[in-house]
């Protein structure tokens, strides 16, 4: 096991971790976190475990606690770590802010990858053209003979790839404004395509949106 994966295990083992939603990337991470010794709570607006369809069997098998329905954010209380998704727009709302004030670590799959990734990271953000730019940069590195790990807002979840990442590789990551809200680690190279007034229904104003991208 690489030392970066060991550091991740040290962060997770024995901790109470709440996941907001069970999207594709979170399903992979939930299993990994349980295997690393975390006590996982899944917070979701669904009303019962049966509403998760085929994933209900995995929830039972892994022994995941559930905080469901209208008050699903109550599951934040008493957690050591909260794993948010890019689609969760309640970052500045009271439940999450109260959790952070109580000392809970709020992070995401891509943020943890930034924290523990041993190779250089090229990050691409902006309002338009992110996916095209990210894809082209990845192709350039591949043509130069580098092993590329492509992810973020494009491709697969990056954190489960961590054991396969070596210092000689390069990670090319697409980031949305929602993913940037709580980012505290910087990439080695940052690319901003442009910033236009998108998603102002989820950001306070254009100034906040612009500052997030810087």
Which residues are covered by each model-predicted region?
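Accessible peptide chain termini
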Residues: 1, 212-214
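N-terminal leader/targeting and accessory segments in enzymes
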Residues: 1-108, 112
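Phosphate-binding loop of NTP-binding sites
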Residues: 74-77, 86-212
């Amino acid at each position: 096991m690489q030392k970066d994966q060991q550091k991740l295990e040290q962060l997770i083992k024995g901790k109470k971790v709440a996941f907001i939603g069970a999207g594709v990337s979170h399903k992979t991470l939930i299993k990994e976190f349980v295997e690393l010794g975390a006590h996982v709570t899944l917070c979701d607006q669904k009303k019962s475990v049966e509403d998760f369809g085929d994933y209900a069997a995995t929830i039972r098998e892994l022994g995941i606690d559930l905080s469901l329905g209208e008050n699903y954010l109550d599951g934040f209380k008493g957690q050591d770590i909260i794993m948010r998704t890019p689609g969760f727009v309640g970052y500045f709302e009271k439940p999450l802010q109260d959790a952070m004030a109580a000392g809970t670590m709020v992070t995401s799959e891509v943020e943890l990858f930034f924290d523990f990734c041993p190779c250089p990271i090229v990050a691409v953000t902006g309002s338009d053209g992110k996916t095209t730019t990210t894809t082209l940069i990845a192709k350039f590195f591949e043509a130069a003979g580098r092993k590329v790990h492509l992810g973020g807002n494009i491709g697969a979840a990056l954190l489960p790839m961590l054991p396969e990442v070596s210092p000689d590789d390069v990670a090319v990551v697409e980031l949305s404004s929602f993913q940037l809200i709580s980012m505290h680690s910087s990439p080695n190279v940052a690319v901003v395509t442009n910033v236009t007034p998108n998603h102002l229904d989820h950001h306070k104003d254009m100034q906040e949106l612009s500052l997030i991208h810087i």
